[in-house]
């Protein structure tokens, strides 16, 4: 299907088939569509609301065109959100990645620089001294040896360059916000995905079911966070054993006291790093305790998704142990020194 015909169909509020979406995405990702056509198509999709079939088709094309990171591990997991929640919270899922690694998981952390927040995962890792310009082989080695590696989206999704201009100029959420977590270059089948709207939980779980994922938690908190919140209940769509179930999680389910998010918002990557370090080292005040608790909640979900724990509660307990032992913070420092070696080689 030609992108012009696709725009006309979507403007009429008709869903594209998965096959039609594949054809249109191939035109976008190979430079055959003009910036005006890309912008018009993305806005029309957003107004209609993207269907499960459309998201699936788009994700398939992005996966095919991505440069792969070769990792074969039964506990390989990703912690990646859609962003766009407007909270400016510190990088919780990035901190959680080091906790999961310390608990015995392997984390292929997929992420990018900030688009809508004050600090994207790439921004805070760079502030921590981690080299983002590692090759796919070097990232794979980091994951195998340390338990965590960072997959910088632009390095693995070079075909995305055709859509960057229209996305930046429009400045609104589009289907591409959802595609980041669905297109991990390491091909993870286990993950926790945070989304900005609870209505997206079930559709994205259905997309991942179609794409072959095995254990996924798609989470969206009642306060709008694209994380499991410390302050309120969180809606979850869980894909496990081929079935999807929906339920609500609370901090109390994991034995953690509910607290406000005051003090956990940041204005820069450096401020985010300060809170991550506070969460992973010694609790000195209420803010560092809250930071530690929200990281433990989200790391616990990822430990459970990685099938290292039999329940969310057990996952959170394992996360708390990994933080308390100092191992999680050690993983952060280890990745920084490991990645610096490759910087010196260049």
Swiss-Prot record:
Mg(2+) 1 binds at residues 93, 227. Anthranilate 2 binds at residue 167. It comes from the Bacteria. InterPro entries: Anthranilate_Pribosyl_Tfrase, Glycosyl_Trfase_fam3, Glycosyl_Trfase_fam3_N_dom, Glycosyl_Trfase_fam3_N_dom_sf, Nuc_phospho_transferase. One of its GO terms (biological process) is L-tryptophan biosynthetic process. Mg(2+) 2 binds at residues 226-227. The keyword Magnesium applies. This is Anthranilate phosphoribosyltransferase. The lineage of its organism: Bacteria, Pseudomonadati, Pseudomonadota, Gammaproteobacteria, Oceanospirillales. The gene is trpD.
